[in-house]
A protein has these predicted regions:
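Short beta-strand/loop motif that positions the catalytic acidic residue
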Residues: 205, 211-213
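Conserved alpha/beta-hydrolase
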Residues: 46-68
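Active-site glycine-rich loops that stabilize anionic/oxyanionic intermediates
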Residues: 31-35, 100, 215
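Flexible "cap/lid" loop of the alpha/beta hydrolase fold
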Residues: 115-149, 189-193
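Conserved loop-alpha-helix segment in the C-terminal half of the alpha/beta-hydrolase fold
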Residues: 213-242
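Catalytic active-site module of serine/aspartate enzymes centered on a nucleophile-bearing elbow/loop
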Residues: 237-276
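The serine-hydrolase catalytic nucleophile loop
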Residues: 32-44, 223
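Conserved acidic catalytic loop of the alpha/beta-hydrolase fold
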Residues: 78-94
Length: 276
């Protein structure tokens, strides 16, 4: 069962397990142009079935959260404040799971708060997106222009969406539902993640971390995911044949199962061992 809450104006979806297996909650953070709906379709109910209490928030000005009229004034720091506010509301340290821009927000949140773990899915690297934009510019300049057109909602083209975000087959109904829920992103936040607000590695908490990427990702290439992993001195897993939208690709269960297996080993296992 998934419930929807408004926590001081922030939309939060809450999936409760029928048979809890872990005391550590999961908090999912969406990427740019999206909302908590990114996780509600598949990941929240799936993880609840696995016994995890799973939450997803819509950052301010996204989804059903407040301040939509102030969208373009919102900063990465504002988004981090939202994540920390929901952690306080939970009353305990969660595992933070962020996709794309949400992964960058998770890294920034770890500068200010401890978490039981962190999962970065096709995440913007700690150095920000400037290098990624140059990489895309030189390797796929037409793709960069098409992607910018799509994500600014100036051309609602399902075929362009499929090419930009998906690598596996996706039916037209699912694609159109995804497209209709996309929204503009804060210009200020995009500037922040591009230039001004790199993750502070010296102050960043280092909980157990899982770094995931997609072989066919046209936004956050495997090279950038590998760069993030190198920065943290960790391995990464690149899912073959998948695109940027790991949450909605046909093979999304592969991603969910990888996260669950990691949780069992690195988070749940450490809790059990600590109490033994």
């Amino acid at each position: 069962m998934i419930e929807r809450h408004l926590v001081d104006g922030l939309e939060v979806y809450d999936a409760k397990p029928e048979q809890p297996r872990s005391q550590t909650p999961l908090l999912f953070v969406h990427g740019a142009h999206a909302g908590a709906w990114t996780w509600v379709d598949h990941f929240l109910p799936w993880f609840a079935e696995q016994g995890y209490r799973a939450y997803a928030l819509s950052l301010r000005s996204h989804g059903g959260s407040h301040q939509y009229e102030l969208l373009h004034w919102q900063s990465i720091a504002d988004y981090v404040d939202d994540v920390l506010h929901i952690i306080d509301w939970l009353g305990e340290s969660p595992v933070l799971i962020g996709h794309s821009l949400g992964g960058f927000v998770v890294q920034k949140a770890l500068e200010r708060r401890h978490a039981k773990g962190a999962v970065l899915m096709c995440s913007a690297p700690p150095q920000g997106m400037l290098a990624g934009q140059f990489h895309l510019m030189f390797n796929n300049p037409a793709g960069l222009m098409d992607l910018n057109t799509l994500l600014e909602n100036s051309q609602n083209d399902p075929h362009l969406l499929r090419d930009s975000l998906f690598a596996e087959p996706i039916d037209d109904d699912t694609l159109n539902r995804y497209l209709l829920r996309l929204q503009p992103e804060s210009h200020r936040a995009i500037w922040d993640i591009s230039i001004f607000h790199q993750a502070g590695l010296a102050t960043l908490q280092r909980p157990p971390m899982l770094i995931l990427g997609a072989e066919k990702d046209k936004i956050l290439s495997p090279f950038l995911v590998q760069s993030t992993a190198h920065t943290y001195g960790l391995p990464c897993k690149i899912f073959r044949g998948m695109g940027h939208a790991l949450t909605h690709e046909k093979s999304w269960p592969r991603v969910a199962e990888t996260i669950r297996n990691w949780l069992e080993k690195e988070v749940d296992g450490s809790v059990v061992n600590a109490g033994a």
